[in-house]
Amino acid sequence: MEEPQRARSQTVTTTASSFAENFSTTSSSFSYDREFLRTLPGLLIVAEIVLGLLVWTLIAGTEYFRVPAFGWVMFVAVFYWVLTVFFLIIYLTMTYTRIPQVPWTTVGLWFNGSAFALYLSAAIVDASSVSPERDSHNFNSWAASSFFAFLVTICYAGNTYFSFIAWRSRTIQ
C-alpha cells in the first residue's frame, strides 16, 4: 500500500526595503530658491546658458559640417548647455538638499572645471577655424560664435572658482 501524501508547509520570510527610503525628504512639496539667481554663481549660470545658446545656434545656422573642427565646438557647446540647464533646475528647485548622498560640491567642481577646460579648447578651435574661412558667407556667424565661446569660457572659469571655494570649505570642516 502506498503511504498517504503528507501536506508540506514552508515558512517564507520576506523583507521589503525601498531604495527611496534611504533618501531623506524634508517636505513633499517642491521648494524654490528665489535668491539663487541673485547670487554671483546663479548669474554666471544664467550667462552660461544664454551665451552657450548663442554659440551653438550661431554655428548650427550655418554650413558648419564643411569644417570638421566645428563638430567639436558643437558637441562641447550643446553638451554643456544641456547640463548647465539641468544644474540650474537642480539649484532652483533645491533638489540637492533632498539627495544628500551626492557630494554636490565635488560634482559642481568637476562639472565647472571640465566645462572650463573643454570650452577653452572649443573656443580656441572655433577661433582658429574662422580665420581661414574669411571669404565665406558664414564668416560673421562663426566669428561671433568664437567671441561668445570665449565669454562662456570666462563664465565657467568664474563658476569653477566659486565651486572650488565651496568644495574647499566643505573638506576643511
Curated annotation (Swiss-Prot):
The gene is CMTM8. The chain crosses the membrane at residues 40-60, 70-90, 105-125, 147-167. Residues 36-168 form the MARVEL domain. The keyword Transmembrane helix applies. PROSITE patterns: MARVEL. This is CKLF-like MARVEL transmembrane domain-containing protein 8. Disulfide bonds: none annotated. It is found in: Membrane. Keywords: Chemotaxis, Cytokine, Membrane, Transmembrane, Transmembrane helix. It comes from the Eukaryota.
